[in-house]
Amino acid sequence: MDVTELEENLFAASDAKLHGDMCKELSGVLCKVLSIFPSLEGARPRSKSGIQALCSLHIALEKAKNILQHCSECSKLYLAITGDAVLLKFEKAKIALIDGLKRVEDIVPSSIGSQILEIVGELENTRFMLDPSEKEVGDQIIALLQQGKKFDNCNDNTELEIFHRAATRLSITSSRVALAERRALKKLIDRARAEEDKRKESIVAYLLHLMRKCSKLFRSEILDENDSPGSYPCSPNEDHGSVHGFGRQLSRFGSLNDKPMNSINSGQMPVPPEELRCPISLQLMCDPVIIASGQTYERVCIEKWFSDGHNTCPKTQQQLPHISLTPNNCVKGLIASWCEQNGTQIPSGPPESQDLDYWRLALSDSESTKSQSVNSIGSYKLKGVKIVPLEENGTTVVERQNTEESFVSDDDDEEDSDINVLERYQDLLAVLNEEEGLEKKCKVVEKIRLLLKDDEEARIFMGANGFVEALLRFLGSAVDDNNAAAQDSGAMALFNLAVNNNRNKELMLTSGVIRLLEKMISSAESHGSATALYLNLSCLDEAKSVIGSSQAVPFLVQLLQKEIETQCKLDALHALYNLSTYSPNIPALLSSNIIKSLQGLLASTGENLWIEKSLAVLLNLASSQEGKDEAVSSQGMISSLATVLDMGDTTEQEQAVSCLLILCNGRESCIQMVLQEGVIPSLVSISVNGTPRGREKSQKLLMLFREERQQRDQPSSNRDEPPQKEPARKSLSAPLSVHGSTPASASVQDYEPRVLSKSMSRRKSMARPFSFFWKKSYSVRE
């Protein structure tokens, strides 16, 4: 790959969200360094200073890569407000690269040294600067954050309008981009909590709150524009259009509209927007606070919730890492502004009674939200969303169409859903809990599977609200009815529910999922989905012992030997790898003839999909003495490993060398078997061209062979040296021929040449496998 192609690939991989010019400059230099780095490693410095110089350059390269990755994965808003810090990181990366390159200049040939000087000169002439537009946006957001502390005296319309403009200038102009931004902010919050950086956490939480507000505006703008025939969406660069759209949508939140005033005149009390009401008390908040999930509640209500022993978010049911409360001055200012606009008094205290049924109130809040949404559907065009009644039931669920405009389908934030997610999930759960109708339940389970596919919050919510038990009951009914299609749907829904969620995996284990899977694997039609679920569960440490002691082990091993779908076989192999990392499972794996199955995969022609993972499983098995013994005694295993040394890629070669090193260590018989395969040329090649770990392992294996040869040759050399007896044999040769008789010592003379001949024969036979190792050149393997 030339420098141009490498640069294109590296920068395409980074895809910087912000600071693109600086990323492009650094990426270009980084590609040039990476293109000559193999030559730098090939110089093989032997001195301590040379090795340290290479290590220093490698660290500098990693720092530069990390900066590019940071600019490609981090939140745009956070990158904007930390522009000065990012600029400093770029400068430090440049200095580190210059220093590292100068240190390796003296240990490389002059041809490479000239390239290094050229790169150093380019780096020294590089000047990193922030984009003026991006810096201006960052300053605006920082000013907004500083005003947040004084938000009681600030107009909510002004704050949201400034934030909306800033987000638009950062190209956050669609619901999809807003979703990606919210997810990036959530990751930053998690990182700040892990680092216990309270200041960073509060800043990012405030940005996330404003981002959620703007997400509604982005989506509503699209709906309004689509609702008007012949109208076109405003360009992201047209600030005037964006501001007008922003003001129009802000009115729909009830902040500056006239409808509440009309309601007052007609004798009706204005209804506060949902964002200003506590999800528990459903009343206008007096002292709003933010909890770890990002939701806002009345302080007294959420404190009562926590004092009752709960450690989850009442609205999302998300497990909370901590129960600390952060005042939400933004919402408090919005409440004050709304009360002023609608002629109502600002709440002077919390609700009088806190003896509340939290779940019922949250649900009723959802129902009121749903009612408002349904009443306003007439003025919207909800493209990408349609309401589909289930057969033989009045339950209504939402089916999302896969069109370009169905941006709602990827949004995992319940605040952005037109039809309340909580109500929708409860409808789905109600269908699953019905006594009859497996076919109807199967359709619901399929919808649940699709909902869970890419929605982490849905997994958290459903896992905490009885969906695990309901899906397991459905799967049990499908197994009892021998319904293969229903079994597949149920197993894959459970699979999606368990993805990246150990709590849901634990619930499945305690609820008897292994027992159901053992019933499923008795039918060949369900092998694919059962294997996939085994794979997912095997990622949990607590599940490895349970699965390892069940019928799953022989079942998964047998799949490796069958002609089945590639994905199913790969799932089985990956599951066995996870199980093999738990050493008490190794005896059960060996008793199921897993070594024979792995040897078959390694020896299969035309399929390289299994080699890397098969070798990884073999390495785990070889960690036990029983595994080593069986691998060495298995017919064809050593030959298969030797073939991988010849034909595999560098990663596979590294694993094969590691396997052979473990098997040969302390085993003379295994060493002879390996040498008979003629592996010396391959090992020498890997020691030069392999991965760093592969080079290290191959050199150790060659050294092991050399030590073994020296140990075997040493006794033979002692027997081959008769310094005093040799002249005696020559002096006795004449008398034997002259006198025609054999003296008493003749028997000794006759014996010694036989011993010498035998010793020479042994050394010759031993040296044959090493012929390539000791010669200066070689061409092909014997």
From Swiss-Prot:
Compositionally skewed regions (Basic and acidic residues) per UniProt? 707-729
Broadest EC class assigned to this enzyme: transferase
Pinpoint the residue ranges of every ARM repeat in the record.
456-499, 502-541, 542-581, 583-623, 626-665
**Protein name (database record):** U-box domain-containing protein 7
Q: Which domain of life is it from?
A: Eukaryota
Q: Which InterPro entries match?
A: ARM-like, ARM-type_fold, Armadillo, RING-Ubox_PUB, Ubox_domain, Znf_RING/FYVE/PHD
Does the keyword Repeat feature in the UniProt annotation? yes
Xref: Pfam families: U-box (PF04564)
* PANTHER family membership: U BOX DOMAIN-CONTAINING, U-BOX DOMAIN-CONTAINING PROTEIN 7
Q: Which UniProt keywords apply?
A: Repeat, Transferase, Ubl conjugation pathway
Catalytic reaction annotation: S-ubiquitinyl-[E2 ubiquitin-conjugating enzyme]-L-cysteine + [acceptor protein]-L-lysine = [E2 ubiquitin-conjugating enzyme]-L-cysteine + N(6)-ubiquitinyl-[acceptor protein]-L-lysine
> What are the Polar residues biased-composition ranges?
739-748
Biological role stated in the UniProt entry: Functions as an E3 ubiquitin ligase.
Q: In which pathway does it act?
A: Protein modification; protein ubiquitination
Q: What is its EC number?
A: 2.3.2.27
